[in-house]
Amino acid sequence: MYRPRARAAPEGRVRGCAVPSTVLLLLAYLAYLALGTGVFWTLEGRAAQDSSRSFQRDKWELLQNFTCLDRPALDSLIRDVVQAYKNGASLLSNTTSMGRWELVGSFFFSVSTITTIGYGNLSPNTMAARLFCIFFALVGIPLNLVVLNRLGHLMQQGVNHWASRLGGTWQDPDKARWLAGSGALLSGLLLFLLLPPLLFSHMEGWSYTEGFYFAFITLSTVGFGDYVIGMNPSQRYPLWYKNMVSLWILFGMAWLALIIKLILSQLETPGRVCSCCHHSSKEDFKSQSWRQGPDREPESHSPQQGCYPEGPMGIIQHLEPSAHAAGCGKDS
């Protein structure tokens, strides 16, 4: 018996919901920003005010104790100290820290520029360097995205390879995909987020929590600049340190991009934006999940050749664009 297909929901509107999905997404976005604003204001506002009052009090006491200093001269000294810090000097001891505009420091600055991390603790001061930085970033940022995409594709191929081998051994493709995806997630957590803080704790004198905070803020390209490697004036850093951290940033960003891609695929799935308004009937489930054979017996809706169901990490189904269009773009 022929049954008419249900009318598809208009584009930009969640099925069964009167509110457009774009409006719901914008409201959720603004609500999330409001949440962050309130929490950070509550946690950091009073501490910032106390720090400012303490600085002004110390400055006033310095002027009272050393009458030879006048206020303009002290303000000029403070500005010079701030500028010296921006130029790479650390005035906490008699010597400066790593020369950040030396060869290794310049390489690390180039990495932080094209990866858009931008810690903010170091910036070019000459006009020639600023102009070069503009063109360097214009070419380097797209190039970095291409490299990250290629590295992510290689990671996907590795996971797919292990999933196919495990599936052939166990004769259970679903379990193999789940195990391969979970292994990729756990190994990435270990290599890029859990183990590096141990190195940072040893080299920088940070706690493990501070090292983990730096690792995530760096790989997510947030880059506040409150924690930056190579800035401890009492530490002698080996030459390989920043180079190895640069490689960690490159591969870690590719791995984290896969995880963020999975989260985005879950958030952008139609019907999950407004789950309270989504109602699926038994007939809808039948029409989407089963087909009737010649004897009116339900048969499984198997994917076409070249199309694979989505695994637990959302990486098994990704194919080359041409193969996907040829195998999945038309209904059988």
Swiss-Prot record:
Membrane topology: Multi-pass membrane protein
A Pfam family assignment: Ion_trans_2
Intramembrane bits: 106-124, 211-230
InterPro entries, per the entry: 2pore_dom_K_chnl, 2pore_dom_K_chnl_TASK, K_chnl_dom
Activity: how regulated: Inhibited by Ba(2+), quinidine, chloroform and halothane. Activated at alkaline pH. Activated by quinine and isoflurane.
Effect of residue 88 to K: 7.3-fold increased current conductance when compared to wild-type
Positions of the UniProt region annotated as Disordered: 287-312
Domain comment in the entry: The pore-forming domains 1 and 2 assemble to form a single pore in which M2 and M4 transmembrane helices line the central cavity and M1 and M3 face the lipid bilayer. The transmembrane helices are bridged by the selectivity filters 1 and 2 carrying a signature sequence TxTTxGYGD that coordinate the permeant ions. Up to four ions can simultaneously occupy the selectivity filter and at least two elementary charges must translocate across the filter to convert it into the open conformation.
Role this protein plays: K(+) channel that conducts voltage-dependent outward rectifying currents upon membrane depolarization. Voltage sensing is coupled to K(+) electrochemical gradient in an 'ion flux gating' mode where outward but not inward ion flow opens the gate. Homo- and heterodimerizes to form functional channels with distinct regulatory and gating properties. Present in the cardiac conduction system where it may regulate action potential duration and beating frequency of cardiac myocytes. Permeable to other monovalent cations such as Rb(+) and Cs(+).
Listed name of the protein: Potassium channel subfamily K member 17
